[in-house]
């Protein structure tokens, strides 16, 4: 398709936020154009298929409790493969289980006698998770906003359970070990993890953006067209200038700040690195997240992806993912350290596992320290220039989808179009 000269709205960025915005604009009958600088849609959500191995661009999962998800995709059509609810924690050579108090109520006695924290700790954590799952969202966001660490301490949880289970868990979720993330964000994470099921599409996480983009008219998706400049009523791409009534910048945080330097400060971001290993046999049989409770702070979490989704590995083999907070160069030394840690965590040798890939995501998640203004930062920057993404909402897949939808609604309102779609 040749680039049009004029449309109502130009969306820059074909990730989850941009695609979600396009869906709402399309439903409203507004003329739009989406420009994506890379050779594919999906942004940070992507899957590489190499010799039969499906490796997502970093360890990512989809939560069925995300409110925006069912409005954008048919969850059944994604052919989901689910992980076991709860987590396993390796501590002092033993595996301990921390259950989801809502999803596994019959497992509560086993949970309460597990070696993670005290009995009081586990009762208090169950109360906190249940409160986050059952209170209305507005009540959660009305609570005083502090850091995640302060929220956990205020709930009466001991230093031991925070360090042995909750810091490792939240480190992988937030890509940050400090627990400085807003308590409002943490409460919403506990809410979704407790209420929903966690899994991946059988075809890989790339199936999610593909499903969101599916109903969109392909000619209005301009792939491989990099936006060079943005201004009121115009976008300049490598193909020329497009005039418009409104612009939505739905790139990653750094890209948005680069296009709107005088209007949008560059946000802090956190990075993640995922090591993918192939093995002839799974180190454990269960599809469950494994955390390091020994406070070594090397691997945030690990999971045998193929235990949940056999489609991720060829010929009955096993795919193991290990995620590290930050950027870890794929050097021989770091690989050796990761193997040693995985062997300790799983309790089996990892020497003969094949290192398949090391995926570093420099902008995995935006930082979300307090205050987070009820998880909704301003999206209209003036002159009908709008910004969308998880850096304007919650740092998550839900935040990206909801942020794109919210921004499209604001654009429709500014154009005098019908918003209630």
Residues covered by each model-derived region:
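Mid-domain catalytic core of redox enzymes
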Residues: 2-4, 228-335, 344-345
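Glycine-rich active-site loop/strand segments that organize a redox cofactor
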Residues: 46-65, 127-139
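Mobile amphipathic helical/loop "lid" adjacent to a hydrophobic cofactor/ligand pocket
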Residues: 69-70, 74, 79-179, 194-195
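Short beta-strand to alpha-helix junction loop
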Residues: 60-67, 140-146, 155, 191-213, ...
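Conserved flavin/dinucleotide-binding core of flavoenzymes
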Residues: 309-421
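Glycine-rich FAD pyrophosphate-binding loop
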Residues: 26-50
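N-terminal Rossmann-like FAD-binding beta1-loop-alpha1 element of flavoenzymes
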Residues: 7-34
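Helical element adjacent to the flavin cofactor pocket in flavoenzyme catalytic cores
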Residues: 185-238, 242-245
